[in-house]
């Protein structure tokens, strides 16, 4: 597995934060790093496989990667990221208690992926721009200024994330997409889902298409297929059982959609034929 080292990314041996744009981010094999990373998705779509679990990401997704997490990107489509790298809590001179603003693992579950709306994403861009222009002076005021900007970024992400509630349509859509991640295998009635999240059906269709480039049903199908591919690789369930577990009522229809999406059959995936030589 590829290991990325801080010496290759941070401007100096003492700098606690670095900015790494990926415009766009191509598919990238599984890797981990000796630093932490906040991945901010500007726009586009892709699959983020995080510690073996697949997540569909799009504009407004924020992922918090710890120094022991492993991840990769695949099936990227104009996926543009800004990566905010930071060494460790101990690397800061003026900041303490950062972990209170970061996702916390509880009972083995780590809520690594947050979502923010487009208004918050614009504020994030402005803050990252200030961080990039803050210079690399090592006197106390310069260091404190850079650390303050990083703290402001964490506060903004925390306040803007899904956990803080939603009022506008953009934020409601974020909640809906998070709901689909957990309920993808259920029979979905889009009229009922739109009502559940206080959106008109027309607004749901328009905004989901703007965020992902896909209609609601195609987005749901892709989500189901991604989950199915994970089970094919990491479980002993039969293809038919996996199809049903992932919301498909017909295994033949599932196999047709699967091949269309990934250019491999479920049996090919089960046998590891899609593995890319490293």
Curated annotation (Swiss-Prot):
Q: Name one GO cellular component term.
A: cytoplasm
Tell me the DNA-binding residue spans: 191-212, 239-262
What broad class describes the main subcellular location of this protein? cytoplasm
| Protein's UniProt keywords contain Coiled coil | no
| Taxonomy, superkingdom | Bacteria
Asked if DNA-binding is a keyword of the record, the answer is yes
Q: One GO molecular-function annotation for this sequence?
A: sequence-specific DNA binding
Write out the GO biological process terms.
Answer: positive regulation of DNA-templated transcription; rhamnose metabolic process
Alphabetized Pfam families for the sequence: AraC_binding, HTH_18
Q: Tell me which residues are marked as the site Interaction with sigma-70.
A: 241, 250
Q: Which residues form the HTH araC/xylS-type domain?
A: 174-272
Q: Could you list this entry's UniProt keywords, alphabetically sorted.
A: Activator, Cytoplasm, DNA-binding, Repeat, Rhamnose metabolism, Transcription, Transcription regulation
Where is this gene product found?
A: Cytoplasm
How does the record describe its quaternary structure? Answer: Binds DNA as a dimer.
The role this protein plays is: Activates expression of the rhaBAD and rhaT operons.
Matches recorded under HAMAP family: HTH_type_RhaS (MF_01534)
Q: What protein am I looking at?
A: HTH-type transcriptional activator RhaS
Its lineage opens with: Bacteria, Pseudomonadati, Pseudomonadota, Gammaproteobacteria, Enterobacterales
Gene symbol of the encoding locus: rhaS
């Amino acid at each position: 597995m590829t290991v990325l080292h801080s010496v290759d990314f941070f401007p100096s041996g003492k700098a606690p934060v670095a900015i790494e744009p990926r415009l766009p981010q191509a598919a990238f094999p599984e890797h981990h790093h000796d630093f932490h990373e906040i991945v901010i998705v500007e726009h586009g779509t892709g699959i983020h496989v995080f510690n073996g679990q697949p997540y569909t990401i799009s504009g407004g997704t924020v992922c918090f990667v710890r120094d022991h997490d492993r991840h990769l990107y695949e099936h990227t489509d104009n996926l543009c990221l800004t990566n905010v790298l930071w060494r460790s809590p101990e690397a800061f001179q003026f900041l303490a208690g950062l972990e209170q603003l970061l996702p916390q693992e509880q009972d083995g579950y780590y809520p690594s992926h947050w979502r923010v709306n487009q208004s918050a994403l614009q504020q994030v861009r402005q803050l990252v721009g200030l961080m990039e222009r803050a210079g690399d002076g090592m006197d106390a005021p310069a260091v404190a200024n850079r650390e303050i900007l990083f703290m402001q970024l964490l506060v903004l992400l925390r306040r803007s994330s899904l956990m803080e509630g939603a009022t506008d349509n953009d934020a409601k859509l974020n909640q809906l997409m998070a709901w689909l991640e957990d309920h993808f295998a259920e029979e979905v009635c889009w009229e009922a889902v739109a009502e559940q999240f206080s959106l008109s059906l027309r607004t749901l269709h328009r905004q989901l298409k703007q965020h992902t480039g896909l209609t609601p049903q195609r987005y749901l199908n892709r989500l189901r297929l991604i989950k199915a591919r994970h089970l094919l690789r990491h479980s002993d369930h039969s293809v038919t059982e996996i199809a049903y577990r992932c919301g498909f009522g017909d295994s033949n229809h599932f196999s047709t959609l699967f091949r269309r999406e990934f250019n491999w059959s479920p049996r090919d995936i089960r046998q590891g034929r899609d593995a890319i030589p490293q």
